[in-house]
Amino acid sequence: MPIVDELEVKLLHPDAALPARTRPGDAGYDLRCVEPFVLRPGERALVPTGLAVALPPGLAGLVLPRSGLAHRHGVTCANSPGLIDPNYRGELRVVLVNLGRDTYRGHAGDRIAQLLLVPYWAPELRVVDELPDSERGEAGFGSSGR
């Protein structure tokens, strides 16, 4: 598992804010938007953060919804989690969707999502004729009951 003490962040916009954790024990870094936006019910928008990052090899970024925004307004990340590969150097943008009943107005500087850094592995894939048995087997959706 990669251990890093610093993450390189490039500010692409004069109003961009460094991602920040609200409390010392928080896992996610809040991402803020740099422009106002309006989301009518059912609409999606690609919202800029004004940031780019250089993730080290072995770490990926997951863009996750903010629970309060989803609970209070029905606004969440449409492709949650959004994946940031370590070789991506472009602007971090968040696909927000309004699942609520009311129009949502975002303001520059609002916290719109969270960035979670996670280790990943990329093993070589091998095609097999049979998979090993498991206790669950092929039991899928709804198989564990209510």
Model-predicted segments: where are they?
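DUTPase catalytic domain/fold
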Residues: 1-146
